[in-house]
């Protein structure tokens, strides 16, 4: 029989027994009977801290792994986790190369769609890698079609992780400026939100993915990978859909960019030896579409926080990849799809020279200073 998940009421019972000398002498069933009427008389605000504790316990339980011992019998969990992280990164890179190679061999590289995802969060739990989601955005992107569609929503988890209100206020004030729960904007039913998001993302899977039940692969920046992974787990856990928690794989968009660029350069006969992950990472850090108007949600446009809007982020990633790769394939840049609406490009495609942009010498695109 599957073990029951911790819930808010049982978190209250445990706290009551720990703080009440009389309660420590009761069995669990007796304590539950004693606490029932007390719980019924509590307000939603009073119950909030116990809901938060139960939530954190559920998410952390899913993340926990059995500790192993080294030869002297000492826990080597850190080394095990380090090795697992290295293996996961290598597997991710192999998968990205396989995806791009498959599209290239089938002559569909220009049409191959990729999913970009970003999350904003309210706060991070102190005792685990748990981020509480505040905003989600995703978009579909291909080299030929640019950004074909996007999905964006704000999220209201109902309450802040217990004891984290001050940290959440500081984080919001210095980044996305979203109001905190319980006054947060957006979707409150996180289970439905996760199901709707998974459905939207899964629409990009091809027939082979559907046939073999392959996970959905999404891309984000290296800095946001732990945030995106944790926020998806949070939504899946809240919606009681743990069995689908592994349906979404989060990959490095910078490594995708590198793989695409090197592949395209090879296709057009341009040397690609100078390209490496440090080069592609630097372009994403520059983020020269950061101040483009008209690509953020209405709220972040109004409060002047477009840089931190997740919708703006995923669109900017598509624009950056388009800017650095489409010229090599003589793909015309379309406003809203490959570039922001107000940007006008005037470059001429010359296969032998267009890739010089990656060395910082391509200056006929309407931008300067990079």
Swiss-Prot record:
Protein name, per record: Protein maelstrom 2
Localisation: Cytoplasm; Nucleus
The protein's role, per its UniProt record: Involved both in the piRNA and miRNA metabolic processes. As a component of the meiotic nuage, plays a central role during oogenesis by repressing transposable elements and preventing their mobilization, which is essential for the germline integrity. Repression of transposable elements is mediated via the piRNA metabolic process, which mediates the repression of transposable elements during meiosis by forming complexes composed of piRNAs and Piwi proteins and governs the repression of transposons.
Any Gene Ontology CC annotation: nucleus
InterPro entries on file: HMG_box_dom_sf, Maelstrom, Protein_maelstrom
DNA-binding region positions on the chain: 2-68
Molecular function GO labels: transcription cis-regulatory region binding
Keyword tRNA-binding: no
Domain of life: Eukaryota
Family of the protein in this entry: Belongs to the maelstrom family.
One Gene Ontology biological process: oogenesis
């Amino acid at each position: 029989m599957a073990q029951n998940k911790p819930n808010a009421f049982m978190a209250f019972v445990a706290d009551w027994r720990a703080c009440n000398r009389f309660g420590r002498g009761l069995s669990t069933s007796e304590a539950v009977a004693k606490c029932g009427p007390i719980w019924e008389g509590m307000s939603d605000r009073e119950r909030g801290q116990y809901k938060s504790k139960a939530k954190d316990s559920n998410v952390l339980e899913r993340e926990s792994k059995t500790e192993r011992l080294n030869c002297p019998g000492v826990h080597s969990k850190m080394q095990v986790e380090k090795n697992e992280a290295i293996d996961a990164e290598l597997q991710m890179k192999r998968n990205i190369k396989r995806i791009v190679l498959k599209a290239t061999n089938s002559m569909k590289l220009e049409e191959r769609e990729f999913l970009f995802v970003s999350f904003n969060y309210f706060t991070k739990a102190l005792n685990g890698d748990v981020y509480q989601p505040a905003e989600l955005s995703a978009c579909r992107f291909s080299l030929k079609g640019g950004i074909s569609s996007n999905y964006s929503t704000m999220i209201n988890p109902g309450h802040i992780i217990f004891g984290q209100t001050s940290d959440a206020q500081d984080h919001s004030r210095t980044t996305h400026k979203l109001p905190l729960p319980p006054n947060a904007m957006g979707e409150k039913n996180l289970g439905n939100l996760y199901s709707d998001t998974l459905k939207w993302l899964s629409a990009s899977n091809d027939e082979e993915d559907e046939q073999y039940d392959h996970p959905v692969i999404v891309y984000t920046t290296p800095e946001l990978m732990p945030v995106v992974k944790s926020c998806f787990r949070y939504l899946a856990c809240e919606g009681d859909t743990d069995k689908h928690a592994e349906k979404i794989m989060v990959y490095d968009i910078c490594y995708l960019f590198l793989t695409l660029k090197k592949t395209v350069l090879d296709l057009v006969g341009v040397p690609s030896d100078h390209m490496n992950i440090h080069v592609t990472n630097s372009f994403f850090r520059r983020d020269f579409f950061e101040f483009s108007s008209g690509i953020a949600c209405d709220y972040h446009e109004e409060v002047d926080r477009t840089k931190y809007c997740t919708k703006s982020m995923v669109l900017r990633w598509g624009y950056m990849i388009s800017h650095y790769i489409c010229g090599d394939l003589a793909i015309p840049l379309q406003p809203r799809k490959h570039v922001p609406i107000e940007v006008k490009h005037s470059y001429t495609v010359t296969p032998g020279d267009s890739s010089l942009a990656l060395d910082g010498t391509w200056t006929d695109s309407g931008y300067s200073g990079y």
